[in-house]
Amino acid sequence: MSKSERIRSVVNSTLGKVTKKDILTKCPDISTAMVEMVLKSMLDEGLIRKVGGGRATAYVRND
């Protein structure tokens, strides 16, 4: 499973909000930059939406 697929899997398997910190904790071998890139891609594809801002930013699946 690629790093991108692992990040997407964490987001899809999390109920409610997920933060970058949650993803980095579950995938410690993946860089912050990679997580940000995949989250942006998922936002652009309309799979997730951003909630909050700054340090309180979280992401929620669009079901």
Show where each model-derived region lies.
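C-terminal regulatory or interaction extensions
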Residues: 1-63
